[in-house]
Design a protein with these regions (language model features):
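Short alpha-helical elements
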Residues: 1-256
Length: 256
């Protein structure tokens, strides 16, 4: 997959150029569009960097540029710019948002790797807005319960505003979580666990919104189309998260 002219026109001013030495010595920088297309090929196929076709750029160039962009937080800034623009144009709705996590198997080393019954892995957390596009994404160890990963997920959101309502499955039925979010002005909506011992705190009225939770499942299906995200090959969690952010960028570009 390669960027269309319309998509590149949006990304070009956001991704920025690369600095040159004052004496202009050394090899010239490869064009950012060719390099980014090469990185997106890796994202889509999940192939090793060394298998990158020569029509893009040398794989060493794409790999170095990718790591540099990740360190500089460029993908994060692009997401913030795209999401803010969509929100201002009414194409993002924070009146109700959906949250969920997915277990990602991969390397038994590096950061954000933890043991579970399914083996060691990483938990990919994501939040979708009322229409379904991504609003937040973060990577964490797979060991903690998902209810403990809500705060990091909210902190990774692409816009400044908080959602009015946050909808999740039974894993998010936790009174301390409800109280913590209520202090932020966020209403947590989740079905009660079958083994819940405390009195119920929700009735059928807010739970009607739970029927639209399929939108977060659709978001994970969209992300699953990028094979580099299905299994974590990166030793460093930040490099894996960079690919997640790239996938979210492509999804947001389609909403424009």
């Amino acid at each position: 997959m390669e960027l269309t002219d319309e998509q590149w026109a949006v990304l070009d001013p956001l991704i920025g150029g690369m600095p040159r030495r004052a004496d202009r010595r050394g090899r010239p920088w490869r064009r950012s569009r060719a390099v980014l297309n090469g990185i997106l090929w890796i994202l889509r196929t999940g192939a090793p960097w060394a298998d990158l076709p020569e029509r893009f750029a040398p794989y060493q160039t794409c790999h170095r540029r990718y790591q540099r962009w990740v360190r500089e937080g460029r993908f994060e800034r692009i997401l913030e710019a795209l999401a803010t623009d969509l929100k201002e144009r009414g194409k993002l709705d924070l009146s109700e948002c959906f949250i969920d996590g997915a277990f990602i198997a991969g390397e038994n080393r590096g950061g954000c790797v933890g043991p579970t019954k399914r083996g060691k892995g990483t938990k990919l957390m994501a939040m979708a807005d009322r229409f379904g596009p991504p609003l937040a994404a973060c990577a964490a160890s797979a060991s903690p319960h998902e209810s403990r990963l809500v705060a990091p997920t909210l902190d990774s959101r692409f816009v400044a505003a908080l959602p009015q309502r946050l909808i999740g499955d039974r894993a998010y039925d936790a009174d301390p979580l409800d109280a913590e979010l209520a202090k932020l002005g966020v209403e947590m909506i989740a079905p009660h666990r079958r083994n819940r011992k405390r009195p119920k705190t929700q009735d059928g009225r807010p739970l009607r919104r739970y029927r639209r939770r399929w939108k977060i499942e659709r978001l994970f299906a969209w992300l699953g189309n990028f094979r580099r995200l299905v299994v974590r090959y990166e030793r460093y969690a930040l490099n894996y998260l960079g690919f997640v952010q790239l996938g979210c960028i492509l999804i947001l570009l389609r909403q424009g």
